[in-house]
């Protein structure tokens, strides 16, 4: 939490932060304001590899980043799901490196997440990162490699273009300006 509070120059927005492991949870992890639930697969009962530990750190940071990207500031409509998921995916890798010491997290990101985005982008179901979501049933289709990994890859490119400090300063302004509100691409 301290890493993101310092990075975003915005205090953790909830009275407490808890994590719960949910047996037979049907997805890896999910955040709610103040609580993240994880599948029991993240509890290592025997020799976890460095890759296992990095993956868990990345997931924890991804879900923790949602406390700002997604909960403190929420998208206006599902078209802008990327404002929540792409940023959390990017912050997962960043947090794995900066807060947890997994120095190869960007290499892992390139090998796994970015390649997932490339594969998803070749399918007939590909779509823009900012998608046209006409109704709620269509929203479920966008929890995919485009919204998560392609969006995060695009953010990584943006950081390379504008610089890390400029990017983070924009995020800080975004949180201060839109805290407890809803946004779209035009607001960012």
List PLM regions with ranges.
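Hydrophobic alpha-helical and helix-loop surface patches within well-folded domains
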Residues: 1-188
């Amino acid at each position: 939490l301290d890493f993101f509070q310092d990075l975003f120059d915005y205090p953790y927005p909830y009275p407490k932060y808890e994590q719960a492991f949910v047996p037979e949870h049907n997805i890896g992890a999910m955040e709610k304001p103040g609580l993240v639930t994880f599948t029991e697969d993240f509890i290592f009962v025997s020799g976890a590899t460095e890759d296992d530990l990095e993956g868990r750190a990345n997931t924890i940071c991804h879900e923790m980043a949602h406390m700002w990207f997604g909960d403190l500031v929420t998208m206006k409509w599902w078209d802008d799901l990327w404002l929540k998921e792409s940023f959390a995916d990017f912050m997962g890798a960043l947090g794995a490196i900066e807060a947890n010491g997994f120095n190869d997290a960007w290499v892992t990101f390139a090998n796994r997440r970015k390649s997932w985005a490339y594969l998803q982008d070749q399918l007939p179901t590909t779509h823009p990162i900012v998608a046209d979501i006409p109704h709620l049933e269509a929203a479920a289709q966008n929890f995919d490699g485009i919204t998560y990994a392609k969006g995060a890859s695009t953010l990584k490119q943006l950081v390379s273009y504008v610089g890390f400090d400029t990017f983070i300063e924009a995020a800080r302004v975004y949180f201060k300006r839109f805290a407890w509100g809803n946004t779209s691409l035009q607001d960012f």
